[in-house]
Amino acid sequence: MTDTTAHKYPLLATPHVRLHGTVDDAMYDSFCNQLAACPKDGMLVVTITTLGGDPEVARAMGDDIRLIREFQGRDILFLGKVAVYSAGATFMSAFPVEHRFLTHGTRLLLHERQITKTINLNGPLRMVVASLQAALNEVETSVAIEEEGFRDLIKGSKVPFDELHEKAPSNWYIEAEEARSLGLVLDII
């Protein structure tokens, strides 16, 4: 981290919201409680360390960040620590690149959403077709949501969508230094 950046972002040393563990309903509750206890004006810092979890919870937390930024005009900084995997990267995508930081040695994990589903075909043929179509609709909608998140994550960076789309199926691990050089984060502290 440069001296200029250190002076510009002294709050990184004392985050307002500290999240760790699985991205789930319990994390969302903690996030909301900590956010409610934050100062009502000025810049905020949110940190996360996670091996992943529920991407929809990550999107909900990200929406809260976006709403605060847009309706209150507040700057909110993201600080990823140690591991920002999967749903953690989904949460990070809610922050503009210029408001993202990682600690030294942190790794990002970007991958495609996963699904495990058994489809039981039983009954009248038209009902079977409807069941198959419903499952296909679920997958197609999930792919669209995933691609929206990928585009948010790389917006303002040097990473082309096609590169992320190519690497995500095999779990793309990105070290902090590489994330900075790719423009996915502003700096490393």
Where are these regions (language model features)?
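Terminal-region recognition feature
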Residues: 1-189
